[in-house]
């Protein structure tokens, strides 16, 4: 019997090795690091020394029966992101002597959770931070939550008569809704609402820019973009507003160049075009006050600071500087008063504060043991595989001849294919096929254990790592908790939240609980590169192996679905105290199975009664005892009250 142990790369593994391997110091933005115990630590804000141990926090939450999978939201990080955004604009305003202010709004679509929006409004109150809404439902949220009469409520999206009427009348409540015209037919509805309600709204226009964008959301800009008015349509709209005596309510120009813009050059081009449109609107007689630069402010998911889809080649300060400088230059060249600048920076505000934690349920991997059988009793094609295995074993501890190893690996693959053909034709038994596969894995392991990282990544050998990789079964639904990973291949930082004093010598990916082949995580950040496997530890028996998915605060909860009827996870809001302790502010309990079924119009009582009738019939037919029936019904009723996720 031959045993194959996992390959260890270093004699001593350090915290610095883990930080480098998972690129934590790059994407973590100083909010996340590793403490002396080898656990992920979370910092109150980027200027603070106050930290808590994430692994310890999760263990203590478990003692309260708040179990993974769960979302942990750090209020202090959310506050710090809002502060950082405003501080960057304040610094840019001072540097460029800009003669107006920055006033941000948060796009509700990024995260509609009540506790989140309340905190954003609270933390941004000193700057009159507002909200951006894109539907009537979101409009109602904005009207209910925004109490600061100096805050703005930017009204985007498709607008029917009722939407416009609500926004128009809300102005009489002391609110500041600005109805942004995004479709030509909205002009007629606004004019009609003014005539019927005897009230006037604040009005804005969204422009379709011709500047080219980039990345996944590049089509948000251009002549064929979903929203906005072309230049001829803007001219016609201004004419109609003048004729309706509404030009004095025209206050805002809005544009949007897409989400997660990775290249600052794209932002600069759009700003130059939009600034000139703003200037021309002023010249046409509109008493403009605001320019809303929309969203697009990206974050560095992978820590590479490049223009890839998962990164940005600019900082928060670079962004603010370019916004302020470009708008100032255009206005001053035309003797136009500097406008108040608005941005709808959702992802940059909300992403960092949320961490999704899940536990690993188990693993699957190729067999670590090989039973050696006598060659005399083997068929020729299996004997060939066995010879290849012995040839590879002879190379152990010898000077590496890479071309020889590549040749032997190609032989092993060819012999395995021959075995598969023989099996299909009925010449090999199932046991013989199994032995052939084990021999192939054994060849791969011999090669892996004899080569360094650079050698094993040779194009002719790179598949060996994939062959030997483990699948880690995750107690979560990708479709519910991180749908962007499935839908658009978004890369999120994924890191074990403990055991960083140990070398993660396993290579693996994750499979979720759903019965769907797309329910896998197989794109990871590794030393700043995107790879299909992650460095992981071997789970310890009867101990949790806990993984964190970071920067998940934007869009994921809103977009998540009920695939296989896995519902919402536990959500916990945490404040970090000055003494490095924490306070649990809010707990939003996970969906029970009963609650999930109710969403689909299934009554738990009816389901239970239907099953009870079946058990009575089974008792009558002596297929089930009364005791078995009672136990079955008890388990069903208990299960309906419990989580849709797996428990211990």
UniProtKB/Swiss-Prot annotation:
Gene3D superfamilies: 1.20.58.930, Alanine racemase, Lyase, Ornithine Decarboxylase, Chain A, domain 1
Region forming the signal peptide: none
Residues noted as binding substrate in the record, renumbered to the chain: 291-301
Pathway assignment: Amine and polyamine biosynthesis; agmatine biosynthesis; agmatine from L-arginine: step 1/1
Keywords on record: Decarboxylase, Lyase, Magnesium, Metal-binding, Polyamine biosynthesis, Pyridoxal phosphate, Spermidine biosynthesis
Role, per record: Catalyzes the biosynthesis of agmatine from arginine.
Protein name: Biosynthetic arginine decarboxylase
Classification lineage: Bacteria, Bacillati, Cyanobacteriota, Cyanophyceae, Synechococcales
């Amino acid at each position: 019997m031959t045993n194959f142990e996992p390959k260890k790369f270093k004699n001593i593994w350090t915290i610095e090795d883990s930080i480098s391997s998972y690129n934590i110091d790059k994407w973590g933005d100083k909010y996340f690091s590793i403490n002396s115990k080898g656990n992920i630590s979370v910092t109150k804000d980027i200027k603070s020394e106050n930290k808590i141990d994430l692994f310890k926090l999760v263990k203590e939450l478990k003692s309260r029966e708040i179990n993974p999978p769960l979302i942990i939201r750090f209020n202090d990080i959310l506050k710090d992101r809002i502060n950082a955004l405003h501080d960057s604009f304040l610094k840019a305003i001072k540097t460029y002597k800009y003669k107006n202010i920055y006033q941000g709004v948060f796009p509700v679509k990024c995260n509609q959770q009540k506790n989140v929006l309340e905190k954003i409004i609270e933390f941004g109150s000193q700057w009159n931070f507002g909200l951006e809404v894109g539907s009537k439902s979101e409009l109602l949220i904005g009207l209910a939550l925004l109490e600061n009469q100096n805050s703005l409520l930017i009204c985007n999206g498709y607008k029917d008569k009722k939407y416009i009427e609500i926004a128009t009348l809300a102005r009489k409540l002391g609110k500041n809704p600005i109805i942004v015209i995004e479709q030509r037919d909205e002009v007629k509805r606004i004019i009609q609402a003014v005539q019927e309600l005897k009230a006037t709204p604040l009005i804005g226009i969204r422009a379709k820019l011709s500047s080219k964008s980039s990345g996944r959301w590049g089509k948000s800009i251009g002549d064929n973009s979903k929203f906005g008015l072309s230049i001829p349509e803007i001219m016609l709209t201004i004419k109609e507003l003048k004729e309706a005596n509404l030009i004095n309510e025209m206050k805002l120009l809005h544009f949007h160049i897409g989400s997660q813009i990775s290249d600052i050059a794209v932002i600069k081009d759009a700003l130059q075009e939009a600034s000139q449109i703003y200037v021309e609107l002023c010249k046409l007689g509109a008493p403009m006050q605001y320019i809303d630069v929309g969203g697009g402010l990206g974050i560095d998911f992978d820590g590479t600071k490049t223009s890839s889809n998962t990164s940005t080649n600019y900082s928060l300060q670079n962004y603010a500087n370019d916004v302020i400088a470009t708008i100032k230059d255009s206005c001053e060249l035309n003797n136009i008063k500097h406008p108040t600048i608005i941005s709808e920076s959702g992802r940059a505000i909300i992403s960092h504060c949320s961490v999704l934690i899940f536990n690993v349920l188990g693993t699957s991997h190729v067999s670590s043991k090989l039973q050696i059988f006598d060659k005399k009793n083997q068929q020729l094609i299996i004997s060939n595989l066995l010879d290849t295995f012995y040839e590879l074993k002879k190379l152990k501890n010898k000077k590496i001849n890479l071309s020889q190893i590549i040749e032997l690996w190609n032989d092993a693959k060819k012999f395995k294919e021959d075995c598969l053909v023989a099996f299909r034709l009925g010449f090999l038994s199932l046991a013989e096929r199994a032995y052939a596969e084990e021999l192939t894995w054994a060849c791969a392991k011999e090669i892996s254990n004899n080569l360094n990282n650079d050698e094993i990544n040779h194009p002719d050998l790179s598949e060996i790592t994939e062959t030997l990789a483990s699948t880690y079964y995750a107690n979560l639904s990708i479709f519910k908790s991180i749908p962007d990973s499935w839908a658009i291949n978004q890369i999120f930082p994924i890191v074990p939240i403990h055991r960083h004093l140990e070398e993660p010598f396993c290579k693996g990916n994750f499979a979720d609980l759903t019965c769907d082949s797309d329910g896998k995580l197989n794109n990871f950040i590794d030393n700043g590169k995107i790879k299909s496997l992650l460095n992981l530890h071997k789970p310890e028996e009867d101990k949790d192996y806990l993984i964190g998915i970071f920067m998940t605060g934007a869009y994921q909860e809103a977009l998540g679905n009920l695939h296989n009827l896995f519902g919402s996870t536990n959500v916990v809001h945490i404040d970090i105290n000055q003494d490095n302790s924490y306070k649990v502010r809010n707990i939003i309990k996970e969906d029970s199975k009963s609650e999930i079924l109710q969403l689909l119009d299934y009554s738990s009582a009816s389901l239970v009664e239907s099953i009870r009738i079946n058990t009575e019939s089974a008792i009558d037919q002596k297929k089930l005892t009364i005791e078995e029936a009672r136990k079955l019904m008890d388990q069903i009723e208990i299960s309906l009250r419990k989580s849709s996720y797996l428990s211990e």
